[in-house]
């Protein structure tokens, strides 16, 4: 119960910031949200090689095992920390990006609706594995109705 309250507070703050930043225009920008990094960095390397004209932002969780300082041309921010400043910067970049590229499930997607013109793309982070995920995960039905509803809102954000 306490965890659900914490999640609800976090998502409310996230939604408020996101809606506040909606006044800013969408920019030619790709924001990568990385919990792992492998696939996202491969895509970034390909974009750089093909000279795709987009600003790039990395939002990374502490679980990301790559040294993003090796990419000084990219703005990088730690994501989902207790830092209010990092949260504000992260939400701003998400709100103003033309492309949002994620490598995992992120609950904040249940609280927002991207502006028309923004594409949210989910990368599969476990190439070659065979497992059930998303709504087919056997544990899905064991979750609370509130959790199930939030998961469905997240999955509705993908194109």
PLM-predicted stretches and their roles:
Residues 1-88, 99:
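N-terminal pre-catalytic "stem/leader" segment of glycosyltransferase-like enzymes
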């Amino acid at each position: 119960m306490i965890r659900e309250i914490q999640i609800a507070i976090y998502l409310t703050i996230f939604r408020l910031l996101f809606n506040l930043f909606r006044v800013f225009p969408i920019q030619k920008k790709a924001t990568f949200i990385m919990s792992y990094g492998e696939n996202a960095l491969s895509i970034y390397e390909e974009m750089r090689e093909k000279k795709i004209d987009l600003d790039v932002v990395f939002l990374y969780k502490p679980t990301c095992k790559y040294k993003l300082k090796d990419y000084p041309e990219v703005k990088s921010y730690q994501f989902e920390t207790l830092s209010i400043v990092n949260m504000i910067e992260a939400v701003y970049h998400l709100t103003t990006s033309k492309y949002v590229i994620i490598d995992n499930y992120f609950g904040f997607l249940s609280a927002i609706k991207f502006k028309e013109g923004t594409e949210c793309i989910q990368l599969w982070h476990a190439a070659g594995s065979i497992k059930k995920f998303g709504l087919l995960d056997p544990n899905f039905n064991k979750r609370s109705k509130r959790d199930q509803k939030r998961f469905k809102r997240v999955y509705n954000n993908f194109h």
